[in-house]
From Swiss-Prot:
This is Large ribosomal subunit protein uL16. It comes from the Archaea. HAMAP family: Ribosomal_uL16_arch (MF_00448). GO terms for molecular function: structural constituent of ribosome. The keyword Ribosomal protein applies. The lineage of its organism: Archaea, Methanobacteriati, Thermoplasmatota, Thermoplasmata, Thermoplasmatales. Belongs to the universal ribosomal protein uL16 family. Pfam families: Ribosomal_L16. NCBIfam families: PRK04199.1-4. Keywords: Ribonucleoprotein, Ribosomal protein. One of its GO terms (cellular component) is ribosome. InterPro entries: Ribosomal_uL16, Ribosomal_uL16_arc, Ribosomal_uL16_CS_euk_arc, Ribosomal_uL16_dom, Ribosomal_uL16_euk_arch, Ribosomal_uL16_sf. GO terms for biological process: translation.
Amino acid sequence: MVTKPARMYTRITGPAYTRKEFMGGVPYPKITTFIQGNQKKDFEIEMMLVAEEACQIRHTALEAARVSVNRKLLDAAGSDNYFLQIRPYPHQVIREHKMATGAGADRISSGMRAAFGRPVGTAARVYPGQIIMVGRVDRNNAKLLKDALHKASIKLPTPCKVVVTKGSKITESLGI
């Protein structure tokens, strides 16, 4: 069945639904790698992607954002010249009440009776001011990191801002 639009699951409504031991089976999240690049090197500049509104980010959106940032940094900077970390983990289970369509569907389906829904995916709950991604680079790749984080923010359902947390004097001198 086709994946429903992410806007159906973006708003945070109700309590967290995370207890997988009571569910019939939850699909694994598409995002599996949360830390990439060189973890040992001490980089000059650190930037963070910070959420500005509360929302739920589906695991597919987190993976799409991670892939876009990683591809841009890996191609231009190389694997040893950056560090990337994805902070939120998709714990929230998303349910969907599948409806039968087509000829004779009214005889098969029970409509909205017992419409709790089956688990179809997971999402991460994010609140205003929460850090979504952390990236670290040296001064020669600072502009590249800022552009990559901005591209990642486009793939997420909440408005985000890029904040320089380390090396702000260097980025100001570079005009970033």
